[in-house]
Amino acid sequence: MVFPAKRFCLVPSMEGVRWAFSCGTWLPSRAEWLLAVRSIQPEEKERIGQFVFARDAKAAMAGRLMIRKLVAEKLNIPWNHIRLQRTAKGKPVLAKDSSNPYPNFNFNISHQGDYAVLAAEPELQVGIDIMKTSFPGRGSIPEFFHIMKRKFTNKEWETIRSFKDEWTQLDMFYRNWALKESFIKAIGVGLGFELQRLEFDLSPLNLDIGQVYKETRLFLDGEEEKEWAFEESKIDEHHFVAVALRKPDGSRHQDVPSQDDSKPTQRQFTILNFNDLMSSAVPMTPEDPSFWDCFCFTEEIPIRNGTKS
C-alpha cells in the first residue's frame, strides 16, 4: 500500500528583534525618497505627506519601512502582500487575515530625537520607547521638573534629584519617562493612564552605551509586577531606549528575564541604514514625483532644545 506523502509547513524560526534607524542623519536623495514611498501602503503615503516638518516625515517613513522589513524577513510574507492596519488607538498592527505562524507575534515602534526604533517578539507582549536627553525649550531644569511633578512618584523624584549635576538629573528624568511609556505602549491604553500608578526602581543607575540591562523593577499601585521585565539600553550618549516585555497571558515566560539577572544581555540594537531598510522592499505603486517636491518644501524642526556636548 502506498501512503500519500505528508506535507510539512516550515515555520520560520524567530527570535526577538531590536532595530534602530538614524533619522537625524538620513538626508534622502530624490531616488531614495520616491522609492521609499512606492514601498508603503497608499494610506500611509497620504499620512506622511501631511507632515509639516521633514524630521517627522522621515521618522514616520522609517517606522513603516522597518515594520514591513520585519514582517517580510521574519514571517516570510512577501513585501507586496503585507497588509498593515491601525488599532483604534492608532497603533500599527498586522492585518488579522495575514498568514502569520506566530499567533502572539507582537511589535512596537517609537521615534524621538534622532532615531526610530523597533522591538518585536514572537510570543511576548512588547512596548518600546526612545527618549533623547535635551534641555527644556524654555525655563530652567528645576522649573521643567516642577511642571512635570505629577508624572513621577516621590521615590522616583528622589532618585532623579539624587544627582548633583542637573544634566544627569535630566538624563534620569528621560530614562524614567521612556520606561513608563514603554509599559503604556505595551498594554495599549494610550493617553489617560495615571503615570503615578507606575513606579520604577532603577538598577543600575548608570548604563553603558551599547549594553542591555534587565534589572529595573516595576511597581503598579505599590505592588511589584514580576511578570513584567524591562530591557534598558543607550544607543548613544543622548538616547535612552526602554523595552517592556510580558507573556500575553500574564505568566512568566522563559525568555522574559528575571530581575535577579544582573548581567547585560546580548540583545542589542542593530543600527540599520537605508539599504538595510529596503533590502526586501518591492515597489507597489507608480512613481509620484510630486511627493518629492512636497517633501522638499518641508522644514526640519528648529532645534530649540540643546543637547550637552
Curated annotation (Swiss-Prot):
Stored Pfam families: AASDHPPT_N (PF22624), ACPS (PF01648)
Claim: Acetylation is one of the keywords in the record: no
Superkingdom to which the source organism belongs: Eukaryota
Consequence of substituting E181A: Reduces affinity for magnesium by 40-fold, and holo-[acyl-carrier-protein] synthase activity by 32000-fold
Consequence the record notes for mutating K185A: Reduces holo-[acyl-carrier-protein] synthase activity by 2000-fold, with only minor change in the affinity for magnesium and coenzyme A
Tissues/organs with expression: Detected in heart, skeletal muscle, placenta, testis, brain, pancreas, liver and kidney.
One term under GO cellular component: extracellular exosome
Outcome, altering H111A: Reduces affinity for magnesium by 75-fold, and holo-[acyl-carrier-protein] synthase activity by 150-fold
Modified residues (Phosphoserine): S258
Its job: Catalyzes the post-translational modification of target proteins by phosphopantetheine. Can transfer the 4'-phosphopantetheine moiety from coenzyme A, regardless of whether the CoA is presented in the free thiol form or as an acetyl thioester, to a serine residue of a broad range of acceptors including the acyl carrier domain of FASN.
Protein name in the entry: L-aminoadipate-semialdehyde dehydrogenase-phosphopantetheinyl transferase
Organism: Homo sapiens
Biological classification of the source: Eukaryota, Metazoa, Chordata, Craniata, Vertebrata
